[in-house]
Amino acid sequence: MCLLFLPPELTLLVTSHLDSPKDFLGLLRASRKFYILLINELYERNVRSDGGSALLWYASRGDEVGVRNMLRAGANVNLRPPDRAQSTALLQAVTTKHTRVVQILLENGALPDAADAQSMRPLALATDGRSDTAITKLLLEYGSMANSVAFDKHTPLLRAVRSNQESKVTLLLNHRADAHILERRTGMNLLHIAASKNASLRIMKMLIDNGIPMDSQDRQGRTPLQVAVTYSSTRTVSLLLRLGANPNFKNKIQFWNGWTALFYAATKSSNSRSDNKTIIQTLVKHRAELDSKNYSEETPLLQAISRGAIKQAQVLLDCGASITPIDANGETVLHLAASSRSWCPNLMSRLVGNGADVNCAGGENGETPIFYAIRNSHDLKA
């Protein structure tokens, strides 16, 4: 007799003797009638076998019906499979950005701060990526700790600032997230991090309003403005200056001793497509000292030339930088421009045309710039 014609009671009796999950699934897929009759038995079997591991599978795929059915069958909402990841259904749903599933799990008792094997909690995952802000809101409303940290010691607020997510930063600060934490490796505070990521005006203002000093320093002695310049974050440079950042604040750490924001701008940008032209012009517009000197008596112009940042040197000259300063080695702009690292005929011509002294003796051996050029085999026709 064909199984399809058996009464439901007898079909269930037959399937109760199918110990192999493969055989049971094969029967389930044989017809729509069997699927409707046996699907709940499938959920219950999974719960009986391991507590309901299928719940994690449904959660990771955003299958609301599957999640509800597994919970109805008695699945442990906080179940962890016996693998290295030690994930939960909630962590899976947050990772895959399924807002409705997150809500269902929380409503059914999912622990909002249950961490995986790497100490990653749902709130850290929600604030690290571009997931729905509603997920962050749900987690906080269900008691997730705003200042929890993962293995990397990064808090949810740091993650939200780093990824420039205004709405999440607002939510976290409203739930008393600590705005004064530091990034462990660099000693950067949240304002430094925001500056490095070209953050929005609203984020910058929220952090400042929460008491982060405008000219606070990281482990390298840099202020948020100097960090913004370092990362060629043009928008943030302008925002910080408008909010009152000091463009002439001098770094006091040994290697960078005496550096102001203009020195960072006069260095070759980490962004190969940027020559920091707009940043330099913005700093000068906000009264940055063009001829400020660092510990080795260099000005931003001298530093730009010595480091081969020719485009930056040209911009500094456009802004009115002096060509007369001499560094601690007795070298002028022409000595440095004639060196092998920063040889540029156009720059040499411009410096000479602007009145740079071609006969000034300097450096360790008291040489004129032409000796530097000859030593480095430069074409002197320019």
Q: What does each model-found stretch correspond to?
A:
Residues 267-269, 295-298, 302-311, 318-331, ...:
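Eukaryotic tandem repeat interaction scaffolds
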Residues 91-145, 149-162:
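A generic tandem-repeat structural signature
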Residues 47-57, 80-90, 115-124, 149-156, ...:
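Ankyrin-repeat boundary/"N-cap" motif
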Residues 47-96, 100-103, 107-108:
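F-box-proximal linker/hinge
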Residues 41, 68-76, 103-111, 137-145, ...:
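Ankyrin repeat domain, specifically the short helix-to-loop turn at the C-terminus of the second helix
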Residues 1-33:
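N-terminal Skp1-binding subsegment of the F-box domain
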Residues 57-63, 92-98, 125-132, 159-165, ...:
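Ankyrin repeat A-helix N-terminal signature
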Residues 144-145, 150-169, 174-204, 218-222, ...:
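Solenoidal tandem-repeat scaffolds enriched in leucines and small polar residues
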